[in-house]
């Protein structure tokens, strides 16, 4: 991980990391992730503005699941000042909490929050989210979810979801998108699962939503206030490629979805995703 100091020099902040993807800033400290760990460097602004030696990283946690399939940890602090961490399913389709090969670990396929040193569930049944953000007015958490593969070109759809209540269940591995039952797992729904939370928007199969960010600035026209910008990485498991664009999802100040449209396109050329 690198940073630019006050003299515009690029400085290495941390190195020799394993799949470090999540980076966020909170209360003067820089936080970053590895697959099974989260670290921080304290007083990073003071260090970079004074050209002091960068201190050693401090361990926040090292007990997260270590599978690399959907194992990258995209991290951020919420409006409640708590650290949010998604844990993707270590497979295309499976039920890790019931399978010995995954140590019956219930943390897979979830979004968790670190609250005073203890982990708690924000959302479960989430296959693989690599982008989330909070509505600037309601503070509700919105997240994308990448749908499973090998069910054909057009199903199931990737999703945009909202968390209205903590520990809600969003369907994986039993149900996908609005009403697509999984051919392998829909007949194995346990008795304690009595509700699936539907997505607020189906994005299309295999488009792979990644980065999400609400806009609350003053530079764009007023119609973009409270708009969620989403990057769609694009497909691989499809005969004709889709995605490869940025979508704008417009909400009102109460968090109600108004409409959505493409914001930037043009990366998909000659149907090759190049």
Give residue spans per PLM region.
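Blade-loop segments of beta-propeller domains
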Residues: 2-30
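Short loop/turn segments that connect beta-strands within beta-propeller blades
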Residues: 4-8, 43-47, 53-55, 114-118, ...
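Glycine-rich, histidine-containing beta strand-loop boundary motifs that form or position
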Residues: 5, 27, 34-36, 42, ...
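Predominantly a core beta-strand signature of beta-propeller blades
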Residues: 8-11, 46-48, 55-58, 108, ...
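Short coil/turn segments at the loop-to-beta-strand junctions that recur within blades
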Residues: 17-21, 63-68, 126-130, 267-270
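Asp-box/WD-like beta-propeller blade repeats and closely related beta-sheet repeat scaffolds
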Residues: 19, 36-78
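Short coil/turn segments that connect the beta-strands within blades of beta-propeller domains
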Residues: 27-28, 80-81, 139, 225-226
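Beta-propeller domain segments
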Residues: 72, 89-95, 99-101, 106-109, ...
């Amino acid at each position: 991980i690198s940073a630019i100091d006050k003299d515009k020099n690029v400085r290495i902040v941390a190195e020799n990391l394993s799949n470090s993807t999540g980076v966020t800033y909170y209360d003067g400290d820089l936080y970053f992730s590895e697959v099974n760990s989260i670290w921080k460097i304290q007083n990073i602004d003071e260090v970079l503005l004074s050209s002091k030696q960068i201190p050693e990283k401090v361990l926040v946690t090292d007990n997260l699941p270590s599978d690399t399939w959907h194992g990258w940890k995209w991290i951020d602090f919420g409006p409640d000042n708590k650290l949010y961490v998604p844990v993707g399913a270590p497979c295309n389709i499976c039920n890790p909490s019931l399978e010995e090969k995954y140590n019956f670990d219930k943390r897979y396929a979830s979004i968790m929050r670190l609250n005073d040193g203890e982990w708690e569930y924000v959302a479960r049944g989430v296959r693989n989210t690599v982008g989330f953000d909070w509505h600037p007015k309601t503070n509700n958490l919105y997240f994308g979810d990448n749908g499973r593969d090998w069910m054909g070109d057009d199903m199931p759809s990737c999703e945009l979801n909202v968390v209205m209540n903590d520990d809600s269940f969003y369907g994986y591995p039993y149900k996908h998108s609005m009403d697509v039952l999984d051919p392998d797992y829909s007949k194995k729904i346990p008795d304690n699962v009595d509700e699936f939370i539907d997505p607020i928007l189906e994005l299309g199969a295999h488009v792979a939503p990644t980065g999400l960010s609400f806009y609350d600035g003053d530079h764009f026209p007023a119609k973009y206030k409270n708009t969620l910008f989403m990057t769609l990485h694009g497909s691989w498991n499809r005969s004709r490629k889709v995605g490869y664009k940025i979508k704008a999802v417009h909400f009102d100040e109460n968090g109600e979805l108004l409409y959505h449209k493409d914001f930037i396109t043009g990366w998909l050329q000659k149907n090759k995703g190049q």
